[in-house]
Amino acid sequence: MRIRSFIIAYVFILAILLFADRRPGHAAPDRYSHVVDLTNGQIPSAQHLSVTESQTRIIAPGALIPGTWAAGQIPPERLIAPLVVVDLNLAAAENSQISLDDIAAWETQHGMIPQGSVVAIRRSNPSSNLSASDSATQYTSDLPIARDAAQFLMEARYTIAFAVETPVDFSSDRTLARQLALHGNYVVEKSARFTALPATGSLIIVAPAKIAPAKDKKAVEAPVRILAMVR
């Protein structure tokens, strides 16, 4: 019931934000202009993709440290947030990670990352652009951000989540996994269409699938539908 209520609420919020400022003679340069569906499904262009058909998944803190939030326990206010996009340059090395220097350079160009943001990490190697269907079949990799950079974002910018285009494996860096869980951060893996997003100014809405009540407190991963409202 909680997840269903949240989905109804986010659709309502979506409608308000998109249409509230569209009044005759009203200048609203900062309003949201369109929505980008970042969900990865079997048919990327499908307009009626259900959450349960989504290949995009949320990894809750409980998947990283047992006893922390499961997917159905993440507070709703942490599922709607400002969205920033940081490019990961893979031209030099396949195992590139976002570094503290990358974060500093991003903020020099775009301004300080808003508190409470979700950080999307976009692959920027021209030779490996991922389509919506490709990202689900890509190799599983570490979260593409250095441990100290992630810790800075969580502690100094109070980020609440990270979104990536590939599957994520935390087995090689349990320290980072622990940091994420202790800060209440979740990860959205196998997302799509990051190339359609600006670096800043968007709003992300994450809607987990409805989980059976008996498993509500145990499921630490779940399919999600994610939308970005773009200015």
What are these regions (language model features)?
Residues 1-10:
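N-terminal Sec-pathway targeting helices
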Residues 5, 17-231:
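Active-/binding-site microenvironments in catalytic and ligand-binding cores
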